[in-house]
């Protein structure tokens, strides 16, 4: 989904940086799930980790997350929690933001995940 969104933005003339947030889970947890292990070992290394400099650089943002029991993934929440310095400086003022999510099943909490993530954006506005 992130790649499709990035491609669409680029086709519309935007300069795009596709990033991922750092993994927080212990290796044992990752190893216990073949799909997760494949992502961490084979897919993730091809996408740079997001930094605060990426957020400073961007004129707008699109945040994506899997739905985890109706909330954004802990990895994304933790990254957002590191942005206090930028928020305090007013770096996010007048920058548009959107979000997207997915889950493995219908009624998997997508609506509440988007609401929880978007609450960060609206309550963090100055």
Segments from the language model and where they lie:
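Short, glycine-/small-residue-rich phosphate/pyrophosphate-handling segment
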Residues: 93-126
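N-terminal beta1-alpha1-beta2 submodule of the flavodoxin-like/Rossmannoid cofactor-binding fold
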Residues: 1-88
């Amino acid at each position: 989904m992130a790649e499709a969104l990035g491609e669409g933005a680029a086709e519309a003339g935007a300069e795009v940086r596709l990033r991922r947030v750092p993994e927080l889970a212990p290796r044992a947890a990752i190893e216990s799930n073949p799909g997760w292990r494949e992502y961490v070992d084979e897919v993730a290394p091809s996408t740079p980790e997001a930094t605060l400099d990426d957020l400073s650089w961007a004129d707008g943002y699109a945040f994506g997350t899997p739905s985890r029991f109706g909330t954004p993934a802990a990895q994304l929440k933790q990254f957002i929690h590191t942005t206090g310095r930028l928020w305090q400086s007013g770096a996010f003022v007048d920058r548009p933001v959107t979000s997207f999510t997915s889950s493995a099943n219908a009624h998997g909490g997508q609506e509440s995940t988007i609401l929880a993530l978007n609450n960060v954006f609206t309550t963090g506005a100055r």
